[in-house]
C-alpha cells in the first residue's frame, strides 16, 4: 500500500527515550511494579484509514481497531485482546513482557522480573473483570505469542457475564490495562 503524508510529527522521541530510561530505573529500584511508556506520532496528509488497517492486517496475531469522525481517525493494532464475548461468555488476555525476536525464549520464561510483571497484569485483569461483575472461570497458562519483530507472554482469562452486567461495563473496567 502507499500513502502520501505531508508531515509526520515525532518531536517527542528524545523525551520518550529519556522517560523509558527513567521507567526502567524505577522498576529496578522497586518504586513501581509496571510502567508502559508510549509516544504519540501524528501524521498529517492524505492517508486512507482503510489502507492503514489493511497494512496492519499483515500481522495476523493482533487485534486491529479503528474509528473516525468527519475530520479525524484513530487506528491501531495491539497484541492485546481487551475483551471478546459470545453470548454471556467473555475472554480477555493478559499480555505483558516483550522479547525481541531472535533472543532466547528461556530469557522470557526464566526471568523473575518478567514473571512478576506478567503476574501483575494477570491479577489486575482478573480483579477488573470481577469488579465489573463478571465471574472468572479460568485463567489459562501463559503462552508465547510471536509477532514479526517481538514475542509476548499471553495468558487467556475466561469468564461469564453476571446477570446484570453488560460487556461495556467490562470495557470500562478493563481499559486501560496495566499492559497499556
Could you describe each region identified by the protein language model?
Residues 1-14, 18-21, 25, 43-44, ...:
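Contiguous alpha-helical scaffold segments within structured protein domains
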Residues 33:
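Short acidic/polar active-site loop segments enriched in Thr and Asp
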Amino acid at each position: 500500500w502507499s500513502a502520501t503524508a505531508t508531515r509526520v510529527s515525532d518531536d517527542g522521541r528524545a523525551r520518550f527515550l529519556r522517560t523509558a530510561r527513567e521507567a526502567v530505573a524505577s522498576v529496578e529500584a522497586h518504586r513501581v511494579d509496571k510502567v508502559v511508556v508510549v509516544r504519540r506520532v501524528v501524521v498529517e496528509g492524505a492517508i486512507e484509514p482503510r489502507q492503514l488497517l489493511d497494512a496492519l492486517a499483515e500481522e495476523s496475531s493482533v487485534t486491529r481497531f479503528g474509528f473516525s469522525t468527519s475530520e479525524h481517525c484513530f487506528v491501531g493494532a495491539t497484541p492485546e485482546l481487551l475483551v471478546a464475548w459470545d453470548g454471556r461468555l467473555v475472554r480477555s488476555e493478559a499480555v505483558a513482557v516483550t522479547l525481541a525476536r531472535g533472543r532466547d525464549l528461556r530469557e522470557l520464561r526464566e526471568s523473575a522480573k518478567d514473571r512478576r510483571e506478567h503476574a501483575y497484569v494477570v491479577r489486575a485483569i482478573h480483579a477488573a473483570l470481577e469488579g465489573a461483575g463478571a465471574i472468572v472461570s479460568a485463567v489459562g497458562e501463559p503462552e508465547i505469542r510471536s509477532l514479526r519483530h517481538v514475542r509476548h507472554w499471553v495468558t487467556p482469562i475466561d469468564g461469564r457475564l453476571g446477570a446484570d452486567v453488560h460487556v461495556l461495563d467490562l470495557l470500562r473496567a478493563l481499559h486501560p490495562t496495566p499492559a497499556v
